[in-house]
Structure formats: structure tokens, C-alpha cells
Amino acid sequence: MNPKLGLTRNVLKRNYALITPDGYVPSVFPGWKNCTPIVLISAALGAGLSQYLISLDTNSTGTGQTEGDEWFLYVVTGKLKVNGTMLTAGGFAFLPPQTKYEIRGAAKVSSLLVFRKTYEPLAGHKTPEFFTGNERDVAETPFLGDKHARLKTLIPDSPAADMAVNIFTYDPGATLPFVETHVMEHGMLFLSGGGAYRLDADWHPVTAGDAIWIAPYCPQWFIAAGPEPARYIYYKNVNRLPR
């Protein structure tokens, strides 16, 4: 696509949005210094989550409090510290509601993905606590028995958890087994590879760096294409009775 000719792969529809790097416009976040935040998904779309992609260097800092929200942080590239804990590429951290955070860049170039939503308490269950990890330590499992489509689950599944964050890896030619149509909302970022994504009744080529918002009940399906596996990280809301 040639942006000088007014061409772009960015698409905004009622039930989904495809946000590609050629259309990124930086924002300014209170408490964040010497960094470049991009708001990929927010309530302005009608979404129930926010998704940010933040570029940092060794002079970058971000401080604040989660208040009533929960944050999931994933290091796409580089390394950084979250409340004193060093996270390298593939590292992640979960920040519960009412948590103070201090984030410091620790490499010349780092990229941080953030999923954020309002936490929904569940009677009889404690709010999940702060934790960190790295996706290299998380085992892959075949998705519905397909060894060519594999999931890594980054947030332990428990009744208290109201969000899931997973990494999906597809070998070339692998697909979702059917067109999914469900109540869960998705926010996602392609980490590597690419393919074709069906969103509602439309088809879109997708590649590393692309972000997608998928509203509840929007039909979706994906096929990986190209010489390397396709990988994306995605959010969905879970474990609560829909209204």
C-alpha cells in the first residue's frame, strides 16, 4: 500500500477493526516519559478493553496506578523492568486492580503491549495477584487436537480471572477449525508471520505488527500463509455470566 496515494489496509467496521502500522499515530499518556504510546483499541471503538503498543528506550519510564482496572503487559521486543522485575522479550506481567506500577525501559529499543480492562469481581473469590513470567516457559498445547495450531495460555485459568491472554501459533497452511461466532471479545497483535483473516463477511491479508479488534459475535476465521509460522497474542473476556 502506498500512503501517498491514500491507500491503507486499515479498516474500521461496526464489528471489527484492523489497525496496521502505516496508520499509527502516537498519543501522550500522563505519567509516561520518553516513550511513544499507540492506542490500538479503546472504548472509542465500542470496545470493552484497551490495547496499547508502547515504544521505549533506556530513558523511558511509566508510573501510575491501575485503579479499578487490570493490566496485562507483554514485552514484544527488547527488555524493561516492571516494579523492579526485569522482563526480556516474551516476558509478561499481570497488574491487578489498585496496583501501583513503575515501568522502566532497559534497552535501546523495546516494544511493550498492554491489554487493559475493568476488573469484574466474583463473589467468594480473591482478586488475582501480581505475577510475572515468560512465554518460553509456557508449554504449547494443540488446539482442539490439531498439532499444527497450538496455544500458550499466559494467565492461569481460575474462576477469579476474568480475562485470558493466549499466544496462538499456526504452521503454514493451518487454520482455525471452523468460523467462530461467540460472545467473547478479542484484541490481538500479530507477532510474526501472516495469512488471511476472515472478519464478519470480509477477508483481509494480515502480517506481523497488525492489530485487530473483534466484537462479540463477529464471525472470524484465520488461515496461516507464507514460509514461516504465524503467531499472534490475543485477549478475551472469560469466566463471567454475560448479561
Which residues make up each language-model segment?
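Asparagine-centered strand-capping/turn motif at beta-strand->loop junctions
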Residues: I103-G105, F222-A225
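A short hydrophobic beta-strand segment most commonly corresponding to one strand
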Residues: L53, F94, A106-A123, D162, ...
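Conserved short histidine dyad/triad with adjacent acidic residue
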Residues: T20-P21, K33-L40, S50-E67, T153-L154, ...
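Short acidic-glycine-tyrosine-enriched beta hairpin
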Residues: V82-K100, D200-P216
